[in-house]
Design a protein with these regions (language model features):
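Ligand-binding clefts/hinges and TM-proximal coupling segments of bilobed small-molecule sensing domains
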Residues: 1-7, 11, 131-148, 215-240
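Extracytoplasmic small-molecule ligand-binding "clamshell" domains
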Residues: 1-81, 86
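Short loop->beta-strand "edge-of-pocket" segments that line small-molecule binding or catalytic clefts
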Residues: 13-21, 37, 115-132, 144-145
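Periplasmic-binding protein-like
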Residues: 21, 98-108, 170, 174-215, ...
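Ligand-binding cleft/hinge of the Venus flytrap
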Residues: 27-33, 44-54, 93, 120, ...
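Short helix-initiation/N-cap motifs at beta->coil->alpha
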Residues: 56-68, 111-112, 146-157, 193
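A ligand-binding cleft/hinge motif common to bilobed small-molecule-binding domains
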Residues: 64, 80-89, 157-191
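Flexible hinge/capping segments at coil-to-helix
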Residues: 96, 105-123
Length: 240
């Protein structure tokens, strides 16, 4: 299986790993040589070791850019959230992490529940092409989405335009809430973002090898160890 997977690599002997640096829960720093550090880079490196090849990181500022690179066949695998729209260009394997998504609302907001937010006239700031943006684009019936580049951009838009809510991942929103007096994170979730490894559609051996790698890493507790190693315990959960 591994030999067949390696035969499908874009560059012999090297695994091109697409990394979304915009997810600060999964990419928490940068090494002296410029390589990204965090759970996602560690998963990419471990996958390369599983295949017996070198790892080569290609970093992007958003998950949408990772998907674009996969569509152009510039990467072998991408570590981003599984989402139906992205599955048009990426063949996703089983998820390895799960992160809940909800809303942040300003002080004095009458919005109390997830359902309250989807109402006529409600304006929601969101990180463009994030998994939860794609999810909300499919499911919201009344509220409108206002997009910005990355969560920092969406947070700035939320503040500057005095929008009604900010959509995002729970751990990041909890940090945002600390910087706004009276802001609240709405309890519950509208979705749980499934972080996964995706391959190109025409790489069946690579997908099979990644699936085998994921089964092994979850069974031996490797993913849980990475959560502890990178200081995000309690913010992320190992996917079932």
């Amino acid at each position: 299986m591994i030999d067949a997977a390696c035969a499908e690599l874009l560059s012999p002997g090297s695994l091109r790993v697409g990394i979304n640096k915009g997810n600060i829960l999964l990419v928490t720093g940068e090494a002296d040589n410029g390589d990204p550090e965090g759970i996602a880079p560690d998963m990419g490196r471990a996958l390369a070791e599983h295949l017996g090849v070198e790892v080569y990181y290609q970093c992007f500022s958003s998950p949408g850019e990772v998907a674009d690179a996969a569509e152009r066949q510039e990467i072998d695998v991408g570590l981003i959230a599984e989402e139906p729209k992205r599955a048009e260009v990426i063949s996703f394997c089983d998820p390895y992490l799960e992160i809940e998504a909800t809303y942040l609302v300003p002080a004095g907001s009458p919005l109390r529940t997830i359902d309250d937010v989807d109402a006529p006239g409600i304006r929601i700031a969101v990180s463009e092409r994030a998994a939860y943006d794609l999810y909300l684009s499919r499911t919201l019936q009344h509220a409108t989405l206002h997009r910005a580049r990355g969560l920092p951009g969406a947070f700035r838009l939320f503040i500057d335009e005095k929008l009604d809510a900010l959509a995002g991942l729970v751990p990041a929103l909890e940090e945002n809430a600390e910087s706004i007096i009276g802001a609240r994170v709405i309890p519950g979730r509208y979705t749980a973002v499934q972080q996964a490894i995706g391959t190109l559609h025409d790489r069946p051996a690579m997908k099979a090898a990644v699936q085998a790698f994921l089964r092994k890493t979850k069974s031996i507790g490797f993913v849980a160890e990475l959560i502890d190693k990178h200081g995000v315990t309690g913010k992320l959960q190992v996917a079932k």
